[in-house]
From Swiss-Prot:
Gene coding for it: TFIP11
Protein name as annotated: Tuftelin-interacting protein 11
Gene Ontology BP, a term: biomineral tissue development
Bias-annotated ranges (Basic and acidic residues): 1-11, 102-115
Keywords: Biomineralization, Cytoplasm, mRNA processing, mRNA splicing, Nucleus, Phosphoprotein, Spliceosome
Protein source organism: Monodelphis domestica (Gray short-tailed opossum)
PANTHER family registered for this protein in UniProt: TUFTELIN-INTERACTING PROTEIN 11 (PTHR23329:SF1), TUFTELIN-INTERACTING PROTEIN 11-RELATED (PTHR23329)
Amino acid sequence: MSLSHLYREGEGAIDEEEDEMENFEITDWDLQNEFNPNRQRHWQTKEEATYGVWAERELEDERPSFGGKRSRDFSAPVNFISAGLKKAADEADEEDSDEEEKPIKQEDFPKDFGPKKLKTGGNFKPSQKGFVGGAKSFTDFGSWERHTKGIGQKLLQKMGYVPGKGLGKNAQGIINPIEAKQRKGKGAVGAYGSERTTQSVQDFPVVDSEEEAEEEFQKELSQWRKDPSGGKKKPKYSYKTVEELKAKGRIGKKLSAPQKELSQVKVIDMTGREQKVYYSYSQISHKHNIPEDGLQQQQLPLPGKDAKPQAFALPELEHNLQLLIDITEQEIIQNDRQLQYERDMVVNLSHELEKMSEVLSHEETVITNLSKVLEMVEECERRMQPDCSDPLTLDECARIFETLQEKYYEEYRMSDRVDLAVAIVYPLMKDYFKDWDPLKDCTYGTGIIAKWKSLLENDQILSHGGQDLAADAFHRLIWEMWMPFVRNIVTQWQPRNCDPMVDFLDSWVHIIPVWILDNILDQLIFPKLQKEVENWNPLTDTVPIHSWIHPWLPLMQSRLEPLYSPIRNKLSSALQKWHPSDSSAKLILQPWKDVFTPGSWEAFMVKNIVPKLGMCLNELIINPHQQHMDAFYWVIDWEGMISVSSLVGLLEKHFFPKWLQVLCSWLSNSPNYEEITKWYLGWKSMFSDQVLAHPSIKDKFNEALDIMNRAVSSNVGAYMQPGARENIAYLTHTERRKDFQYEAMQERREAENMAQRGIGMAASSVPMNFKDLIQTKAEEHNIVFMPVIGKRHEGKQLYTFGRIVVYIDRGVVFVQGEKTWVPTSLQSLIDMAK
């Protein structure tokens, strides 16, 4: 009698078709698990021993299992299983028996694949309701559509479905329904081979990888059985190559690196179970390492179904072997690192060798060049000796310095050229200029000095004593060797003979340094000119002052402004007894018109010339029958010297009242209108177009025309000359047409000027600020407006407006007064600048 009913797993061998009946015959599973101590047991309860098969089952019976046993559904109808399926199950048993005959090794067992989890094909229970009554064919599927019109078919046809083609926009759907293949027996999926249909094989061809996976699965599936041959598991070895160790580095726990012996330091080790005290760090490195792997191996496996007894275990030996392996791996890694370090060191040393070779080559080149430079300097020193038969000249010395600069530039730049120039060039330069007279030969030595300028200038050199020289070699050369000659000739020079000195400085202005030229003009030339201006008397001196002052304007420019005030004072004194009939005053004053500022010139004219001209016009007698024009010519000759407004004021005050009075008296005495017309046109032709364009002058001549028209229209006198009225009317029309044309032409010119300025200002269409407004006004009045470089007041930039120094702060212009800065208006600023 079999006791298989005591095992819950054995229920898979009971015939599932028999209602609540248990077979007591011995099955294959009973034979295979007869000597298996780890098989799962089901101990019979007291209730089962008493009632047997009529005992109530516990809830664990309802749990799913690999046996396929399920609780019966007694409410379902009785179904009968066809005999054909039984035959298929027998065939599956034969296949399983064939697989059991194959020897299975123990090492091929899966890790978590035990005998309790896999059963034979006959033990797998299919669904109670599956395949009952046999599988139905899909041939007559939807046969009712032959006699009826289904709503599904109609909807599909409305959406574009064509019978016989696939669904979808491009008819990409399948045409035939998915075929199903009936499984032969009651085994699991894949127990009877491939279950793929012909349609599946066509649509999805079988690849080799699936066949390999199937073979692998069958191989692992058969490993649940016990190895009948009783063979032992073959040990597996893991090999590591040197390349793997180099690539992955240290594998496993790191070994403590050797440390240097430190001084006696108390170290408390609390890493273990007990606190330990060490007196150096080296003792920690010598501490015994507990074999962790060994401890794990010493732990006994937990009792259970998968536990295997270990017959032979030596954890100490395994730890020592593992330690030797770790040490060997560490040595391999250390040796690889040392080898890589040595290779890197070789590469580094090779680079350093190349670099040192380059440095050595450069130093050799420098030594060679310095040797050649030293030879050239020694040669110059030898030729400068007094008893030398071939003395060194200044031109030859310049060529030697050119060679040093072109071929040995680095050595020449690093050398102390100031000392070299002082030792070699200065004696030669002094000997070169010893007989030179600058006023007689002003261009002597300009070529050789210009050459030395390119050789010695623009270098600030530190002397051997470490003191910073204020000037370079060329500046020192000019100051010490050239300036003494200039000082000597300036002390003997007469300022009224200015041409030789001006020519001399013009020849040297582009060669000598700027600060030396400023020193000559400020310290030597200007004091001589100032002293000569003080001694000048415009009444007695026959040489005009502008003849020896104006030639200095290109060189000195604004430096001469302090001389202008005493010159104006002396001229004012000389003009006190002057009469306009003396034309020499105009010859003396005319050269100064463009030198003085417009404001100072106009003030000088108004004070000294305009009153004299007014007196001359007062003395003018207007007589149409016998006119003397000398006084009028004396006044008109000053038109370019005095402003138009001043001249118009003189004419309005001293000329036109008398002229209109004479016209009225002439018209009241039976005049000849032709003579009056000629007289009118004659006086008008005496004035220039600029004067005639002035509105006041136009008004005076128009007033004369009105007087003439009134005289003609009022029939003054007993006799009227024929055509006089027409002539006067024609004259009036002609004159006014000329005035109109002149005004139109002036407006057109102003429009063109505005257009030109508009084109120039089109690019800068941004709103003008106060500074731009001042700049515009300065351009309109020909006043120089520019910033003073490097000068500020309270952080504000200083500007020069003519001769006035100003600064702008928040839209207000401030002018420098005697003690403080005073705010002023723009018009006042323009008046002060003039």
